[in-house]
Amino acid sequence: MYIENINGPEDVKKLSEDQLNVLAEEIRDSLLKKLSKHGGHFGPNFGMVEATIAMHYVFESPKDKIVYDVSHQSYPHKMLTGRKDAFLYEEHYDDVSGYSNPRESEHDHFTIGHTSTSISLALGLAKARDLKEENGNVIDRKSTRLNSSHRCIS
């Protein structure tokens, strides 16, 4: 399994396109197994697997900041940022929260649950980056049940 060898976004970048497709299947299989036994958010996560893999393939998290508007869609992100065991192994299912959580990982920047906060949070991160004269992108991960969009605030 490719997911077992993913300890951070840098490992995603090492995979070929075919391997990335298999990784997406493995993520969905792991989510289905965990969420069937433990509960959690199915739809928001299943619909964002490829987009999450692509973001971690293209951007440099945590230097590039990814902000989730609906952070209960962040399970694939958690799996790709060092928290895969909480989705692969039943004894670790309670190791992560159902939302983004900066106490869990440097790849999470806010504790957020539901919608309508990401634009202002992303703009705040971009302004702070500019004031500190730092580099990096800020990606606003906006999503609803029917559509999704991603904004890169540079």
Model-predicted segments: where are they?
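Cofactor-/ligand-binding subdomain signature composed of acidic, glycine-rich
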Residues: 1-34
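Alpha-helical hinge/cap motifs
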Residues: 16, 143-145
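Cofactor-binding active-site loop characterized by glycine-rich and histidine/acidic residues
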Residues: 23-24, 29, 41-143, 151
